C-alpha cells in the first residue's frame, strides 16, 4: 500500500503526462485517411505550439488564432461552435491555410481575425495556389517568410525541409497533390520544430544542367556541350573536322537538337527537384542560395560557384518575359464570376440608356453633342486600352514580379513600352488634328450647309452612329399611326423615288442591327471574362473600355431602331436582348478556365476587335459629321479622346499601386 502523498504524486504525474501527450497527431495522415478529428484540447495545443514557433518584429507574437476561429473555418454555417465541437479531418486543409497565413504575416493575420475576414482570406489563399506555377512561387515565398519569422533554428538538424520534400510527402500520402495537402505537411513540420529552406540548394543548378543535357551521366559529351552552348547563344562553329567530308553523321545539328532540348524545358521531369524549374530568382535570391553577403559582393571564387545558377536561369526560361500575374492580383473563381457579372451588368444597362433619348427629345441638339462626346471618349478608351494595356500584356511587356523579386528592371521595361506606345497614340492624334483643322478651315460644300445643324457628309458606314438629331425626336403621331407615317414625318426625304427603294432595307435594319450587336456583345463578354481571369486590374481596364464604347453604340442602335419605325417598347426589348449575349460570352470565358496562354490569345483577339470598332466604326462617325458649331464639336472630340487616353495611361502606369 503506497502512502497517500505518493499516490497523489503519481496521479498528478499521470495528468501532466496526459496533457503533454495531448499534442496533435500527424495531420497529413489524418487528412489522407479521411477519418478522425481534432478535439479542442488538441487544437489548443497545436495553436500554442504554432505561436511559439513564430517571432514577430517587436517580440513574441500574440495568440490571436483561437480554437473558436479554427472551428468556425471548419463549420462556416455555425460561427459559434458548441464546446464539444471537434475539427473534422476534411477541414484540416482550412486549418493549414490559416496557419500558413499566420506564419507568412502574423500581424496582418491578427488584424484580419479581429475584422472577421479570416475565412474569406483562407478561401482566397487556397484559390491562388491552384495552378502548379502559382503553388511553387507562393510556397517558396512562404518558406522564406517562415525562415525570417522563425523564433529559433534547430542546430542539430543537417538539412532543412524544402518544397520538394513537402511535395513528396503530400504525394506519398496516397492522395492527389494539391496546395492544401502541401500546407498540411508544412504545418506538421512546423509543429515538430523543423527548419525550412525556401530556395533551392546550390547543387540543384548543376543537377538541372546535367539533367537536361547529359544523356550519359555523369559527364556531358562534346556533342551535348555544343547543343548547350548553342542554346545559350555562345560559342562558334568548329571547322576542325570539316576536312573529313565522308563522315557527315558525326556533324552536329545544333538547331535540331536545341529545338528538342527546348521542348524538354517545359515538360515534367522525374526528379523531385524539378519543382524549382519555373522559379525566377533575383540577384538577391542567388546570393542567398550561396550564402554570399550583399555588402561584400561576389568574389572571383564565388563567381565560379554561382555561374551554374545563371546558366540554369537562362536554360529554364523561368525569367523569360511572359506575362505573370502577382498572386495578390488574381481572383478566386467566385470573385471572377461576381465581378465579371457586375461589370457585364453595367455594360448591359447601356441598352436602357436609350430612354434618355426620349427624355431629351426636345433638346435633340444637346443629345447630339453628348453622343459626339461619347463617341470620341469611346475611341480614346478603345485605342488606349488596346495600345497601352492589352498589347503590352499580350506581348509580355507588362509583367509583375513576385514578392521578394527585384521589380526595378520590370518596371523599366514595362514603363518604356508604355511611353513608346503612347507615342503611337501621339502620331494618331497629330494626324487627327491635321484632318480636323483642314475640315474646319477649308470652305464647306453648299450641300452640307443645306443638310441642317448636323449632317454626315454622305458617309454610310456605321448608320447607327451617324444619325442626325432629327432622328432622335419622338413621333408626334398617336400610337394608331402607321410606322410608315412615322418615318415619313420624321424623314420627309424618304418620299422621293430614290429613298423609296431604301424602305425594304429600313425594314431589315432592326434585325441586322440586333444580330450584329448580339455578336459584338458576345465578343465583348469573352474579352471581359478573359480579362477578369487574368487579374482584377486587367478586368477593370477592359470593362472600362467596353463600357465607354458600348454607351454611344447602344444609344446609336436605339436611335436607329426608332428611325426604322419600331415602337419604343420593341426597340428597347431588342436592344436589351442583344446586350444580354455579353453574359453568354462572359460565362463561356470563365467556364472554360483558360490558362495564361489562352488568356493572351483571347486578349489579342479583343485588341483587334477594339481597334477595328474604334478606327473603322466610330472614328469615321466622328470625322464625317458636319455641324453649325464646328469649333464646339472639335473641342468635344478632343475632350473625349484625351480623356479616354489619360484614364488608360494612368491605369497602365499606376495599376500596381492600386490596392483594396
Swiss-Prot record:
Superkingdom of source: Eukaryota
Motif (Essential for SLC39A4 endocytosis): 465-467
Domain notes from UniProt: The two metal binding sites M1 and M2 that are halfway through the membrane form a binuclear metal center. M1 is essential to Zn(2+) transport, while the other, M2 appears to have an auxiliary role presumably by acting as an additional transport site that can modulate the properties of the primary transport site. The binuclear metal center plays a key role in Zn(2+) sensing.
Function: Selective transporter that mediates the uptake of Zn(2+). Plays an essential role for dietary zinc uptake from small intestine. The Zn(2+) uniporter activity is regulated by zinc availability. Also exhibits polyspecific binding and transport of Cu(2+), Cd(2+) and possibly Ni(2+) but at higher concentrations.
Membership in a protein family: Belongs to the ZIP transporter (TC 2.A.5) family.
Record-level GO cellular component terms: apical plasma membrane; cytoplasmic vesicle; endosome; plasma membrane; recycling endosome membrane
Regions of this protein lying in the Cytoplasmic compartment: 359-376, 442-511, 567-571, 621-630
Effect of residue 539 to R: Reduces zinc uptake activity. Accumulated to high levels in the plasma membrane. Does not affect KM. No longer zinc responsive
Residue intervals on the Extracellular side: 23-337, 398-420, 532-539, 593-599, 652-660
Keyword match Nucleus: no
Organism for this UniProt entry: Mus musculus (Mouse)
Biased composition (Basic and acidic residues): 236-267
Listed InterPro entries: ZIP, ZIP4_12_EF-hand, ZIP4_N, ZIP_Transporter
Keywords: Cell membrane, Disulfide bond, Endosome, Glycoprotein, Ion transport, Membrane, Metal-binding, Signal, Transmembrane, Transmembrane helix, Transport, Ubl conjugation, Zinc, Zinc transport
Binding-site residues, Zn(2+) 2: 521, 524, 550
Catalytic activity: Zn(2+)(in) = Zn(2+)(out)
One annotated GO molecular function: identical protein binding
Binding annotation for Zn(2+) 1: 520, 524, 549, 553
PANTHER family: SOLUTE CARRIER FAMILY 39, ZINC TRANSPORTER ZIP4
Record-annotated disulphide pairs: 56-61, 64-110, 160-195, 280-319
Record protein name field: Zinc transporter ZIP4
Amino acid at each position: 500500500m503506497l502512502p497517500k502523498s505518493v499516490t497523489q504524486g503519481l496521479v498528478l504525474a499521470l495528468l501532466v503526462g496526459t496533457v503533454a501527450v495531448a499534442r496533435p497527431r500527424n495531420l497529413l495522415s489524418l487528412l489522407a485517411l479521411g477519418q478522425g478529428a481534432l478535439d479542442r484540447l488538441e487544437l489548443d495545443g497545436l495553436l500554442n505550439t504554432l505561436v511559439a514557433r513564430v517571432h514577430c518584429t517587436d517580440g513574441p507574437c500574440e495568440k490571436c488564432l483561437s480554437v473558436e476561429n479554427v472551428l468556425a473555418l471548419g463549420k462556416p454555417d455555425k460561427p459559434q461552435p458548441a464546446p464539444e465541437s471537434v475539427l473534422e479531418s476534411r477541414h484540416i486543409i482550412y486549418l493549414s491555410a490559416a496557419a500558413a497565413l499566420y506564419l507568412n504575416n502574423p500581424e496582418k493575420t491578427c488584424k484580419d481575425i479581429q475584422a472577421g475576414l479570416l475565412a474569406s482570406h483562407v478561401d482566397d489563399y487556397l484559390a491562388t495556389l491552384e495552378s502548379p506555377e502559382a503553388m511553387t512561387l507562393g510556397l517558396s515565398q512562404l518558406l522564406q517568410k517562415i525562415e525570417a519569422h522563425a523564433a529559433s533554428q534547430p542546430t542539430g538538424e543537417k538539412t532543412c525541409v524544402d518544397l520538394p520534400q513537402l511535395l513528396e510527402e503530400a504525394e506519398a500520402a496516397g492522395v492527389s497533390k494539391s496546395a492544401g495537402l502541401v500546407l498540411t505537411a508544412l504545418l506538421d513540420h512546423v509543429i515538430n520544430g523543423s527548419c525550412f529552406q525556401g530556395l533551392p540548394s546550390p547543387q540543384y543548378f548543376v543537377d538541372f544542367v546535367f539533367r537536361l543535357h547529359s544523356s550519359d551521366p555523369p559527364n556531358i559529351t562534346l556533342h551535348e556541350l555544343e547543343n548547350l552552348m548553342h542554346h545559350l547563344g555562345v560559342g562558334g562553329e568548329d571547322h576542325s573536322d570539316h576536312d573529313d567530308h565522308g563522315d557527315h553523321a558525326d556533324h552536329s545539328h545544333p538547331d535540331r537538337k536545341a529545338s528538342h532540348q527546348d521542348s524538354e524545358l517545359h515538360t515534367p521531369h522525374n526528379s523531385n527537384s524539378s519543382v524549382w524549374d519555373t522559379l525566377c530568382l533575383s540577384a538577391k535570391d542567388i546570393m542567398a542560395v550561396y550564402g554570399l553577403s550583399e555588402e561584400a559582393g561576389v568574389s572571383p571564387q564565388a563567381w565560379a560557384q554561382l555561374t551554374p545558377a545563371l546558366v540554369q536561369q537562362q536554360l529554364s526560361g523561368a525569367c523569360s518575359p511572359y506575362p505573370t500575374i502577382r498572386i495578390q492580383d488574381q481572383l478566386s473563381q467566385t470573385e471572377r464570376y461576381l465581378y465579371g457579372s457586375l461589370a457585364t451588368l453595367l455594360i448591359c444597362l447601356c441598352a436602357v440608356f436609350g430612354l434618355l433619348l426620349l427624355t431629351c427629345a426636345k433638346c435633340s441638339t444637346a443629345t447630339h453633342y453628348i453622343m459626339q462626346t461619347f463617341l470620341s471618349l469611346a475611341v480614346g478608351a478603345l485605342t488606349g486600352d488596346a495600345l497601352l494595356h492589352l498589347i503590352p500584356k499580350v506581348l509580355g511587356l507588362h509583367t509583375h514580379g513576385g514578392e521578394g523579386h527585384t521589380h526595378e528592371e520590370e518596371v523599366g521595361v514595362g514603363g518604356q513600352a508604355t511611353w513608346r506606345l503612347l507615342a503611337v497614340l501621339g502620331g494618331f492624334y497629330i494626324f487627327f488634328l491635321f484632318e480636323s483643322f483642314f475640315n474646319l478651315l477649308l470652305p464647306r460644300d453648299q450641300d452640307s450647309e443645306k443638310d441642317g445643324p448636323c449632317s454626315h457628309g454622305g458617309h454610310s458606314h456605321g448608320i447607327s452612329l451617324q444619325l442626325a438629331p432629327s432622328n432622335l425626336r419622338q413621333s408626334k403621331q398617336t400610337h394608331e399611326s402607321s410606322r410608315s407615317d412615322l418615318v415619313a414625318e420624321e424623314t420627309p426625304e424618304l418620299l422621293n423615288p430614290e429613298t423609296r427603294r431604301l424602305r425594304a432595307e429600313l425594314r431589315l435594319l432592326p434585325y441586322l442591327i440586333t444580330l450584329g450587336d448580339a455578336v459584338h456583345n458576345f465578343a465583348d463578354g469573352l474579352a471581359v471574362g478573359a480579362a477578369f481571369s487574368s487579374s482584377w486590374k486587367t478586368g477593370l481596364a477592359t470593362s472600362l473600355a467596353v463600357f465607354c464604347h458600348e454607351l454611344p453604340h447602344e444609344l446609336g442602335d436605339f436611335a436607329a431602331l426608332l428611325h426604322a419605325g419600331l415602337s419604343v417598347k420593341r426597340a428597347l426589348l431588342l436592344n436589351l436582348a442583344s446586350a444580354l449575349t455579353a453574359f453568354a460570352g462572359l460565362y463561356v470565358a470563365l467556364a472554360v478556365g483558360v490558362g495564361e496562354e489562352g488568356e493572351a490569345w483571347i486578349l489579342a483577339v479583343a485588341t483587334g476587335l477594339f481597334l477595328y470598332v474604334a478606327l473603322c466604326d466610330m472614328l469615321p462617325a466622328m470625322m464625317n459629321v458636319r455641324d453649325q458649331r464646328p469649333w464646339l464639336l472639335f473641342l468635344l472630340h478632343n475632350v473625349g479622346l484625351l480623356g479616354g487616353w489619360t484614364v488608360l495611361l494612368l491605369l497602365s502606369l499606376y495599376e500596381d499601386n492600386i490596392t483594396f
